[in-house]
A protein has these predicted regions:
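Residue-level signature of transmembrane alpha-helical entry/exit and packing/kink sites
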Residues: 12-20, 46-55, 89-94, 140-145, ...
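N-terminal start-of-chain detector that recognizes signal peptides
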Residues: 39-42, 52-55, 120-125, 156-157, ...
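Transmembrane helix-loop-helix hairpins at the membrane interface
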Residues: 100-107, 129-234
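N-terminal, membrane-interfacial amphipathic/helix-forming hydrophobic leader that caps
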Residues: 1-88, 110-111, 227-234
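Juxtamembrane helix-loop-helix connectors linking adjacent transmembrane helices
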Residues: 39-50, 76-152, 170
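Membrane-interfacial segments
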Residues: 34, 38-42, 72-77, 112-120, ...
Length: 234
């Protein structure tokens, strides 16, 4: 595929994979410990404020892992190593994200809903988002909005497309990498009913990051996608 020439030598794929796994594992340990401290299990009844603390801790682990990789195995500049740049044209990604949520994802689930009507219902597909919204009120609604619309898109694009995909593209076939990272992105969310939609969305943001050579477009697309999904259940 045609994509921009890298001005910085990408981080070695093996290093990126190890850094990804180590940071992800650290995030899980932190999450479990914090949930235990708050006396929570991480289920649907977990308060938004607790969820916010746990998520921020996990994201801290992700970003710390990326910083360590960049410092010891890259240029020392995360901006250059992970393509953390946003240009005005990247704002088009907001529209792409909205279309992905309203059109593309619906198309993905049409045949699935026809084949398994009791499984792939609108109620089931929106359950996770609705449970989050139902738990929020007042100030925690603002917290939820910030986490879903800004926190998750920025950190996830940094971690999946910046750290992992960017390094793998320098060594392996573009198509294989885009598909593989999108599949990993979907599976790690641990919500099987959402796997098809998350996988297709992963392909969209993966292509955006690869074709532009930076994370701005994929981050904006992710923001537009999450914002639309949240507004649909408010």
């Amino acid at each position: 595929m045609i994509r921009p020439t890298e001005s910085v030598v990408p981080i070695d794929a093996q290093t990126a994979i190890f850094g990804f796994i180590a940071a992800w594992f650290a995030a899980q340990v932190l999450s479990v410990v914090l949930l235990g401290v708050f006396g929570q299990t991480g289920g649907a009844d977990t308060p938004i404020e607790v969820l916010a603390v746990v998520l921020c801790a996990a994201w801290f682990a992700y970003v710390s892992g990326m910083w360590i990789v960049s410092t010891h195995h890259g240029t020392g500049s995360p901006v250059d190593d992970f393509g953390i740049r946003v240009l005005p044209i990247d704002l088009l990604g907001l529209g792409i994200g909205v279309l992905a949520q309203l059109v593309v994802i619906r198309i993905v689930y049409l045949p699935l809903g026809a084949l398994w009507p009791r499984t792939f219902t609108d109620e089931e597909l929106q359950r996770n988002a609705e449970e989050l919204v139902d738990r929020a009120s007042g100030g925690t609604t603002v917290v939820l909005f910030v986490l879903v619309v800004f926190g998750a898109p920025i950190v996830e694009e940094l971690f999946y497309r910046g750290l992992l995909q960017r390094s793998l593209l320098a060594r392996f076939n573009d198509v294989v990498v885009i598909i593989g990272v999108a599949a990993l992105f979907a599976v790690i969310h641990l919500r099987p009913i959402e796997y098809p939609g998350l996988f297709v969305f992963g392909l969209i943001v993966g292509m955006a990051a690869m074709l532009t050579g930076r994370l701005g477009m994929s981050i904006m697309t992710h923001i537009g996608f999450n914002l639309t999904g949240l507004l649909l259940v408010l």
